[in-house]
Amino acid sequence: MNLSNELKLGLALVLIALTAILSLWMLHRATDPKTCKNKVKGMLKRFAALRQYKVLSDVTVQYEGKKAHFDQILVGVYGISFVSCLADSAAYYGQEREEKGTKVDSKTGKKSYFANPITAGEKAIDLVRRVFSKNNVYGIQMEHLIVFAGSPRKTEIFVKGSIPMLRRSDLKKLLDKVRYEEDRGVDVEKIVKLLQDHAE
């Protein structure tokens, strides 16, 4: 084998190694919970920016000694969407009224439990209603969205509930619906300030 062929072989091996490293990095990034949560946040922020809506991230509302955490809150003239984000790439199992659900990690196969996002969301939104009531804010349409934000190919959903169980792509389709453009007279700035005033 002459020097030219050795050089070509060496370059080919380097390219193969770089391709493998890049593929592994992209796979890790696609299944990283922080990256997955940020994708949902980015989707909501882009949607909000075009409409002068607001997005609050990682908010813990407190009132009368109780706390309610929200991954994302979208506030618009239509009302408020409280978003719970389950960011792990896993298979999720659960029933609407069970206290906990089960998830099986797609990489390790390890089984763990997570708090039922449906009942947790109901309690959290009830606390926000009490904050609004104390401040004479009524008639705001509020919804709770659960987004399974993990890698689409590595996430399976077997959770039964009366509210939608969304993947990231489902969230985008949902936000395209006309109801998110309807002006129901919500004062976006006032609601955002009220939530921030009661946040940790």
Regions found by a protein language model. Name each.
Residues 1-68, 74-96, 101-200:
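Surface-exposed interaction regions that form or flank ligand-binding interfaces
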